[in-house]
Structure formats: C-alpha cells, structure tokens
Amino acid sequence: MDSRITITEVRVRGFHLDGYGHVNHARYLEFLEEGRWAYVDAHPEFADGLARGVALVAVNLNIDYRRAAVMNDDLKVETCLTRIGGRSGVVGHRITHIGSGELVAAATLTFVLLDQQSGQVVPMEGAWAERLGPLVVDVSEEK
C-alpha cells in the first residue's frame, strides 16, 4: 500500500445505527474524521504544521453512499490527500466493507488551513507546498 494513504478500521456499533438498522448518514462524518486524524498522525509533515497554530477547516464535503453498513460490519477507511491548490486542498476517502471489499462510501473533503491566531486562511505555498506536495496521490491511478 502507498505510504501516502492511511487505513483506519472501524467496527459498526449499535449507536452508529438509525431506525432502519443502517449506519446513520451523520456517523459517516465521524468515520471520515477518524480517517483524517489518522492521516495527520501518520504524516508528521502535516502534523508539525498543525501543531504550530494552524487548523484544518472543512469547507465542502461530498459523500457518495454506495452500500448500507450494518451492525458489526468491519469497515476500512482509506484517506489520502488528492489535491493542493493556492488556498485549499482536497482529501479523498474510500470506505469499504472489509469482508466483501465492497465500496460502502466515497467522499471528498475540501479544506483550508486557518491561522488560529489571526483567523486568516494560510496560503498553501512555500513551506506548506513543500510539506504537502509530496503527499498528493493521483486517485485516477488508483484501482
């Protein structure tokens, strides 16, 4: 597996379910968040910058739900950086069912980096471009 992609495993529990016995749509946001934090933990070049008073702030999220996840399903959340631009970046996620390999959901999250002291967006140039550029994965080349 490409070291630029992190894997987080999640077991579906009862509190994740809605009245129909499926994972509630809002809980997928938590699964994706777990994936992003695992990604930051695995990439010190990202974590070091965030530790210096910069926050990763979600500005857009798109989720494509493909298959219902139910109680006791084991899910794999794959997370990678798919694009960085001048002021924003995109994180890609794939959630698959571990047993069957079926795609459960795919998501893209657009984010900005925010200086927590000034409240201003931090441009993704200079040191940030050097940190994040090598982490970008071309998902069109993925399976």
Specify the residue positions occupied by each region the protein language model found.
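Terminal targeting signals and extreme-terminal segments of soluble enzymes
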Residues: M1-K76, T82-K143
